[in-house]
Amino acid sequence: MSAPYDLVCIGAGPTGLACAIEAKRAGLRTLVIDKGCLCNSLYHYPVNMIFFTTPELLEIGDLPLVCAAEKPTRVEALKYYRKAAEHYELDLRLGEQVTNVCGSDGRFEVHTRSGDGVTASYTARKIAVATGYYDLPNRLGVPGEDLPHVSHYYTEPHPFWRQDVVVIGGKNSAAEAALDLYRNGARVTLVHRQPALGANLKYWVRPDIENRIKAGQIRALFDTRITKIDRDFVFVSGPGEEQKLPAVQVFALTGYHPDFAFLRQLGVQLDPETNKPAMDPQTHESNVPGLYLAGVVIGGNHTSEIFIENGRFHGKQIVAALTGVTPPAPAT
C-alpha cells in the first residue's frame, strides 16, 4: 500500500474540489474519490440550465469563472470545474464508490469499489465528506414509482413535444421544468400536495408559472397527492375527487437528501429530528475525531441552507484546523 494521504475527500463536486484545492495549497497530500464523474450532480442537472447566481459566487481556488452572459450555464460550470481540477493537478479517483471507512483519527482505511467490481483501498490521516445530496431523491412511496417512464431528474423537453407529461412538485425545479416542457410543446399537468406553489420560487419564475396556470396553458392540481402510477396514467387524490392523468412521462421533482445512511455508517451522530450531523461549526470536525464534513451534508433535512456559494468555503475551515491555523469565520 502507498504512503498515507494527509486527507481523502469523499465527493468530487464543487465543495469537495474546493476542499482538495485548499489542502493541496497547504502542502497536504490529498486524494478525491467520487462514485460518479467529476461534479456528478451538476452533470445531471437539466441540460440547458442557467445558474441563479453570478459567476464569482461559484469560483473555487481563486480561479475566475468566465461566462458569455451575466449568469453561467451548466456547460460553462462543468468546463470551469474541469479546468480547476486540471490547474491544481488534483489526484482524482472517479467512478469509485466508497464502500467502507475503518480505522481512526490518524490512520483511516478507505475502501472502494468501481463499477466493474474492482476494489481498492487508501490510507488517510484525515477524511472530509462532501457527498452532496442530489443522488438521493425524496421518494413518493407509491406503486409504480420505479417504472421506466418515471424520473426524479429533469433533463430536456424535446422528446415530449405534443405528449402528456405530469410534473410532481411545487418548488423551483418543478416549476422550471413545467415551463420548459410547456414552451417546447408538451401538454403539462403540475401536481403539488401543498395548497400553493413554494414560497421561495425565483422572482422571475413565480409570475411566469402563475400566469401560465391562470391562462390554462399549464394545468395545476394543488392539495393533491399521487396514489399510484401505471404505464399510461398517474392516479391522484385531490379535494373532493380522485382522477387519473394521462402521462407518457412523469417527473417527480420532490427534492433530494444527503446520504444519511452513509454518515451513520461512518459513526456520525445525526439529530433525530433534523438529521443535522454533530459537528464543530468552526472546524467542521464531526463527532468522529479526524472526520470532517463539508457542503450540503451539514444541513441535514434543510438542504436549502447550503449551496455552492457557501459550501465552497468549508474547505478553508477544515484545512485551517488540519494545519493548526486559526480557522476563518463559518461561511453563511
Which residues make up each language-model segment?
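Short glycine-/acidic-enriched loop or helix-start segments at secondary-structure transitions
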Residues: 19, 42, 103, 138-140, ...
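FAD-binding core/adjacent interface of flavoenzyme oxidoreductases
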Residues: 1-10, 25, 40, 44, ...
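Alpha-helical elements of Rossmann-like donor-binding domains used by nucleotide-donor carbohydrate transfer enzymes
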Residues: 80, 208, 314-317
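A Rossmann-like FAD-binding core segment of flavoenzymes
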Residues: 87-124, 183-274, 326-332
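Rossmann-like dinucleotide/flavin-binding elements
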Residues: 2-5, 9-35, 153-197, 243, ...
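Short, glycine/charged-enriched secondary-structure capping and boundary segments
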Residues: 23, 45-49, 107, 141-145, ...
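Beta1-alpha1 glycine-rich phosphate/pyrophosphate-binding loop at the start
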Residues: 5, 12-90, 175-203, 271-273
